[in-house]
Amino acid sequence: MEYNTSELCDLFADSVDVVDPIFASFGGRYSFGGEITTVKCFEDRGLIDRVLAQPGAGKVLLIDGGGSSRRALFDASSAQVAIDNDWEGVVIYGSVREVDSLAELDIGVLAVAAIPVNAECESVGEVDLPVNFGGVTFLPEDHLYADSTGVILSPEPLDLD
């Protein structure tokens, strides 16, 4: 499904939060949304890969990587795992790599930066906890909507009918 965050902000101004404009789009899908699952980790991607291996239909993985631009938490192989498990998209408060390959894949990917250095893979981190960045607190099961204009967050799914 395609989303227009500008229109959603007009329609649901009192019930959405707008995330600060800190992200660039790296995936081949520019509009995506769904219920979020959160991961908090720092320069370690092992837990991310484990979560993406689970069914993700209608979900967006939201990663708080501390905003690090020293190591990439997500790449084309992670994106393929996400696609294979039906995730709608991934939002990373951190970095990605293999950006040319990511751009060819049908998944939404937003991140702060790109760097060629891979993160560790020791599965250090936490899943399904509140995280805060971009001027917003993200709670597990909140609903995120993203497009080329921005990212918005709602505690409930928005009635788009």
UniProtKB/Swiss-Prot annotation:
Transmembrane segments: none annotated. Keywords: Cytoplasm. GO terms for cellular component: cytoplasm. It is found in: Cytoplasm. Its main location: cytoplasm. InterPro entries: RraA (IPR010203), RraA/RraA-like (IPR005493), RraA/RraA-like_sf (IPR036704), RraA_gpbac (IPR014339). The keyword Cell division does not apply. It holds the Pfam family RraA-like. GO terms for biological process: regulation of RNA metabolic process. CDD domains: RraA_family (cd16841). Gene3D superfamilies: Ribonuclease E inhibitor RraA/RraA-like. GO terms for molecular function: endoribonuclease inhibitor activity; enzyme binding. Homotrimer. Binds to both RNA-binding sites in the C-terminal region of Rne and to RhlB. Belongs to the RraA family. Globally modulates RNA abundance by binding to RNase E (Rne) and regulating its endonucleolytic activity. Can modulate Rne action in a substrate-dependent manner by altering the composition of the degradosome. Modulates RNA-binding and helicase activities of the degradosome. PANTHER family: 4-HYDROXY-4-METHYL-2-OXOGLUTARATE ALDOLASE 3-RELATED (PTHR33254), REGULATOR OF RIBONUCLEASE ACTIVITY A (PTHR33254:SF29). This is Regulator of ribonuclease activity A. The gene is rraA.
